[in-house]
């Protein structure tokens, strides 16, 4: 039950952060069809989870409870694959196949690159 509460706490914080960041990105972005708020949240989430994975790779650096709070709760509540899927479907239904394809490819490629970068940054920092 304790870990469920940790997930709920992390999820609440992550969801509130997602809502806030998405609103800021929407307010300051150009009016175009690319779903920039969700894209921004998801790539930042990839960077953060990469950094957390780098920290977790050090034995005992992140406790199992903290891992549940951060990975499952915080980052899980922050990123949003379901919104990514829905926005892609809307783009496809509106006939915006090129934008949908760019969104899919850039989300995956940029997300993976930032995950790797986050992991490597933490690894380099911890070696110094």
Swiss-Prot record:
Na(+) binds at residues 76, 79. Its main location: membrane. It is found in: Cell inner membrane. GO terms for biological process: cellular detoxification of fluoride. It is a multi-pass membrane protein. One of its GO terms (cellular component) is plasma membrane. GO terms for molecular function: fluoride channel activity; metal ion binding. The chain crosses the membrane at residues 6-26, 36-56, 68-88, 99-119. Keywords: Cell inner membrane, Cell membrane, Ion channel, Ion transport, Membrane, Metal-binding, Sodium, Transmembrane, Transmembrane helix, Transport. InterPro entries: FluC. The keyword Cell inner membrane applies. Na(+) is not transported, but it plays an essential structural role and its presence is essential for fluoride channel function. It catalyses: fluoride(in) = fluoride(out). Belongs to the fluoride channel Fluc/FEX (TC 1.A.43) family. PANTHER family: FLUORIDE EXPORT PROTEIN 1-RELATED. Fluoride-specific ion channel. Important for reducing fluoride concentration in the cell, thus reducing its toxicity. This is Fluoride-specific ion channel FluC. The lineage of its organism: Bacteria, Pseudomonadati, Pseudomonadota, Betaproteobacteria, Nitrosomonadales.
């Amino acid at each position: 039950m304790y870990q469920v509460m940790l997930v709920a706490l992390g999820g609440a914080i992550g969801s509130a952060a997602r809502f806030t960041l998405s609103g800021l990105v929407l307010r300051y972005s150009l009016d175009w069809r690319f779903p920039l708020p969700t894209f921004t949240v998801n790539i930042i989430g990839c960077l953060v989870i990469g950094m957390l994975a780098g920290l977790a790779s050090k034995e005992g650096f992140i406790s199992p409870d903290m891992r549940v709070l951060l990975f499952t709760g915080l980052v899980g509540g922050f990123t949003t694959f379901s919104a990514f899927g829905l926005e892609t479907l809307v783009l496809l239904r509106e006939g915006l196949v090129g934008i949908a394809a760019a969104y899919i490819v850039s989300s995956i490629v940029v997300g993976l690159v930032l995950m790797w970068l986050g992991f490597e940054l933490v690894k380099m920092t911890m070696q110094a």
